[in-house]
UniProtKB/Swiss-Prot annotation:
Full protein name: Flavonoid 3'-O-methyltransferase 3
Residues reported in the UniProt entry to bind S-adenosyl-L-methionine: 232
Function: Flavonoid 3'-O-methyltransferase involved in the biosynthesis of polymethoxylated flavonoids natural products such as pebrellin, aroma compounds which contribute to the flavor of peppermint, and exhibit pharmacological activities such as anti-allergic, anti-oxidant, antibacterial, anti-proliferative, and anti-inflammatory effects.
Species of origin: Mentha piperita (Peppermint)
Keywords: Methyltransferase, S-adenosyl-L-methionine, Transferase
Active site as annotated: 270 (proton acceptor)
Reactions catalysed: quercetin + S-adenosyl-L-methionine = isorhamnetin + S-adenosyl-L-homocysteine + H(+); luteolin + S-adenosyl-L-methionine = chrysoeriol + S-adenosyl-L-homocysteine + H(+); a 3'-hydroxyflavone + S-adenosyl-L-methionine = a 3'-methoxyflavone + S-adenosyl-L-homocysteine + H(+); rhamnetin + S-adenosyl-L-methionine = rhamnacene + S-adenosyl-L-homocysteine + H(+)
EC number assigned by the record: 2.1.1.42, 2.1.1.-
Gene Ontology molecular function, alphabetical: O-methyltransferase activity; protein dimerization activity
Keyword Methyltransferase appears in the UniProt entry: yes
Gene transcribed to yield this protein: OMT3
Amino acid sequence: MEASFENGRKRSSSSSSEEESAFSFAMELAAGSVLPMVIKSAIDLNLLELIKRGGEEGASAYELAAQINAENPKAAAEMIDRILQLLAAHSVLTCRVETPPSRRRRYSLAAVCKFLTRDEDGASLAPLSLLVQDRVFMEPWYHLKDVIVEGGVAFERAYGVHAFEYHAKDPKFNKIFNQAMHNQSIIFMKRILEIYKGFEGVKSLVDVGGGTGASSKMIVSKYPLIKAINFDLPHVIQDASPHPEVEHVGGDMFVSVPKADAIFLKWICHDWSDEHCRKLLKNCYDAILGNGKVIIAESTLPEDPNSGPDTIHAIRGDVIMLTVNPGGKERTEKEFRTLALQAGFKRLVKVCAAFHTCIMECHK
């Protein structure tokens, strides 16, 4: 009887623990927007960069409030302290309490802030956070349910135009978007140039949809013999700074692509439908000189669902594409191979992967 009672108590305890865990997870999901919005506010206030300047000592909320020109420093410090406690609870920051008499909390950067504060090249993922939490980017989510029931694209329902058409109408948002892509590209390309050797021997390169040219500039810095073209829509390249080894060319990739030994497609295919991608890849096929290649950099969905970080990143991106771009989606490696073959290529091979992105090559 005693053993039976003990087993029952253990089962009850286990059940209670599972229920507590499930409740906590449900609460986290219900309030899921709080953390990213607080991170956005911290970035807007430059708090992470200010804490970084404090080095190992970090900074207190009162020290930070004194540096942001707040009209009421004491009230600002109290509010800053409250949002920094949330960031510390989520391991974005670390926190320690000063010795008496002050007993103030001091905050330092946790490991993740390596990517949320500017690196030696001035790049970080902070602009990406500002983009994803921007009002323009947030509004389409309120239309997702409607387009599932009634059809259409959430972004177009919100603004009446395709996302890339909207950029040309809203210079402020276009700049926010370009800054996010520019910074993310620098971080990603720095890693890719360490592990991917496929640019060796290339004499000419076109970066299709290359934005303001961050990737092209980094490629030619490592491979100075490459003649590079940064190819994007005219309103995009207008924000591109000049570079002696990179030519900025405006155009429409669905009409034609400049000719080169290699064509680079980084985070482009996921913006478009299969039909658009076949057209783009066919244009790339026609533009490749000799035995050149197309280099695709994209997240890839797994054939079998799992909850690994690469999968979570890809599926999250897929749902963003669902909301923003008509026909846009993430794909499996098999789906990319099918598109490449349909465009005329003989084969597609996966070469390497980094930061949740696969590098694949299409060969004639």
